[in-house]
Amino acid sequence: MQAWSLWGGNGEPFSSEGKWKVVAEDKHSLSTEIHLVDFVILCLGRFSDVPNIPDFHPNKGPEAFHGEVIHSMNYADMDYVSAANLVKGKQVTVVGFQKFAMDIAMECSNANGVELPCTVIYKTEHWNLPDYLPWGLPLAYLYFSRFSELLVHKPGEGLLLSLLATILSPLRWAFSKFVESHVNKKLGLAKYGMVPKHGFLQEISSCMIATVPEKFFDRVQEGSIILKKSPSSTFSFCQEGILVEGESSPVKTDLVIMATGFRGEKKLKDVFVSPTFQDRIVGSPETILPLYRECIHGRIPQLAVIGFSESISNLFTSEMRCRWLSELFAGTFKLPSIKEMEKDVEKWDKYAKQYASGQYYRRSCIGALHLWYNDQLCKDMGWNPKRKKGVFAELFEPYGPMDYVTS
């Protein structure tokens, strides 16, 4: 493999050089099946199975707490009645401030009201959206059109596109401020000290946008939800509840729900038995996941990953990748050399670090470059990347799944 210049030795999806051994275990019967296959497609996703639990100093973790600690994954696995019974009549603390955290806080608020308010401990404020119509204009016109993508620097862009992105940077800033002003006005973020320090473009480029549940901040105002910022990610448990750094008294609680996300990279890594493949699939912690077209690893043959890299519409993006992969199987195109694939990954890594938030570039988000990314897939498959009728429509109308129904 080290000597190959082409993927799998020949640049094609299938090779006579080897097969994958897939071991599947039935966890109920504990029976095991072994399959030899020519190609493996990992459709794992990153938001399940392996919870992200913060590390704690000895005797400062959940073991020091007298109550119950669960992850949001466990809460989501419950049926509605069981989940309602779990939080009813309890002082609940939710750790996190993304979609899971806000939804769970709302359910706790519904169950217990102001008598037993739910405390939400968060580290970073986010531009979570009340709707997708900033000041009545569909968000797609601002971020999912060819014109909107002219405002950002793109991986592999030429000199002209680079100059345009630089010249139009004030408009890029104006788009962000337009959305931010709507969110701030509608949710009253300033009133609660919840205005993020970063811009909306960084948020969408990191795929960190969530939809705020209806009347969430009304519950904050009435007191059934309490927002408490932890100055850093450091907090610890004590017998009565959670100790936030810089505060002398703990947040007293009966139940802690950790809405702290998932360790998708660990799940992906642990699929492999080989330490070599384990290291290669996740790459360096200082770069994005090293996948060409967000699907293929240049140094791991006869394998594809679907649905791990994020976008604003993951189903749409995964469908495009599936079509790209099917055309690769059909022989419509061949992959470039391994070096070329790795150079392309480096360009996307540079883009991610330029626009995504520091701790989130590893999410390999294409949130602000849907069209640029889909254009590359289309060109590989021999499709015309321009899908609209007319110059004005092509430049200013948003693109969506229906634009790619036919080849």
Regions found by a protein language model. Name each.
Residues P138-Y141, E340-W348:
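Post-kinase regulatory C-tail/linker adjacent to protein kinase catalytic domains
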Residues F144, F329, W348-Y351, D403:
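Alpha-helix boundary/capping detector
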Residues V345-K353, C365:
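Long alpha-helical segments found as membrane-embedded helices
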Residues M1-G136, L161-K339, A356-S407:
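Flavin (primarily FAD) cofactor-binding/catalytic cores of flavoenzymes
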Residues W127-L159:
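A catalytic-pocket lid/entrance helix-loop region that shapes and gates access to the active site
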